[in-house]
Amino acid sequence: MVPTKNQSLDRSASPLPARPDLPEPPADIHPRTLDLVRRGVDEISRAPNGAQEDTLNTSAFRIGRLVGAGAIGLEDACRPLEEAGVAMYSYDARRPWTAGYIRYKVLRAVSQGAAEPDPIAAIL
């Protein structure tokens, strides 16, 4: 849909999704969980033009599944993903990535992933 003159192009104004009820993460995050978060951050950082949004969503969803399993807390999962997203190069200068939009995308995808907990996280 093409926005009209009266519609805002400011993607940062989108309301944030509600935070899901999630299990408490362990006091110490398992090294394998941290490796998976680092891998997601790396994938986001290296995402090429045309694949950035999909890469951000896929990585955040995958980490969200670990959040849902209780392997990592919501904030510990979202923070590095958001930082990687904000650092993405904006290939389209007319639509630069904004912190608010990245935060919205990450929280939404992590929340959706948390609704489908990763069964492998139970053995971490």
PLM region spans:
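Modules that initiate DNA replication and primer synthesis
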Residues: M1-L124
